[in-house]
From Swiss-Prot:
Highest taxon, organism lineage: Viruses
Keyword annotations: Late protein
UniProt name for this protein: Probable protein L3
Lineage of producing organism: Viruses, Monodnaviria, Shotokuvirae, Cossaviricota, Papovaviricetes
Amino acid sequence: MSLRMHYTIQRPTNMSSSRGYRDHRMHLSLTSKMQ
């Protein structure tokens, strides 16, 4: 649950940017793998 909250809080303002979105997805995957 905290992970979801973290994603929402740290979500970049320019979601239209595919690069920023992909970077965030990567970060999320890495964090979930580490857990």
